[in-house]
């Protein structure tokens, strides 16, 4: 069953990217990238991880805009993907991109310090 949940998650990720970029007209929703979709084993709940370009205020506004459009997004997913029941969708920020950027910055600093000591 886990394989099916992964396949549904990948298909939802592809469709959500298209829906958010082309169908959502809310001005609060800025430049959004869907980084991952985790679907529960029973295909009832989908957690959508997003990355938003901008400051904290823009991120919060984007999350509010997506929450407002959740019903529309779910109905679009239901039309595009044939499932018995469309999963309940929740949006969360993907912190891994910022975390990865921080690690990259620290590694560059360590590399610079190592070259100075030589």
Swiss-Prot record:
- A single Gene Ontology molecular function, please? ribosomal small subunit binding
Q: A GO term (biological process) for this protein?
A: maturation of SSU-rRNA
Source organism superkingdom: Bacteria
Gene3D superfamilies noted in UniProt: 3.30.300.20
**Record's keyword terms, sorted:** Cytoplasm, Ribosome biogenesis
Q: Where in the cell is it found?
A: Cytoplasm
**Cellular component, GO annotation:** cytosol
PROSITE patterns of this UniProt entry?
RBFA
Subunit info here reads: Monomer. Binds 30S ribosomal subunits, but not 50S ribosomal subunits or 70S ribosomes.
Q: Which family does it belong to?
A: Belongs to the RbfA family.
Described by its record, this protein's role is as follows: One of several proteins that assist in the late maturation steps of the functional core of the 30S ribosomal subunit. Associates with free 30S ribosomal subunits (but not with 30S subunits that are part of 70S ribosomes or polysomes). Required for efficient processing of 16S rRNA. May interact with the 5'-terminal helix region of 16S rRNA.
Q: Please state what the protein is called.
A: Ribosome-binding factor A
Q: Which organism's genome codes for this protein?
A: Bacillus cereus (strain AH820)
């Amino acid at each position: 069953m886990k394989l099916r949940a992964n396949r549904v998650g990948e298909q939802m990720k592809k469709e959500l990217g298209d829906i958010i970029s082309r169908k959502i007209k809310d001005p609060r929703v800025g430049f959004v990238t869907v980084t991952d979709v985790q679907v529960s084993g029973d295909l009832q709940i989908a957690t959508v991880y997003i990355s938003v370009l901008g400051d904290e205020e823009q991120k919060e506004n984007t999350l509010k805009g997506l929450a407002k459009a959740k019903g529309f997004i779910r109905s679009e997913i239901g039309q595009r993907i044939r499932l018995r029941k469309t999963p309940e969708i929740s949006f969360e920020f993907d912190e891994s991109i910022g975390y990865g950027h921080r690690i990259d910055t620290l590694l560059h600093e360590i590399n610079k310090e190592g070259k100075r000591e030589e």
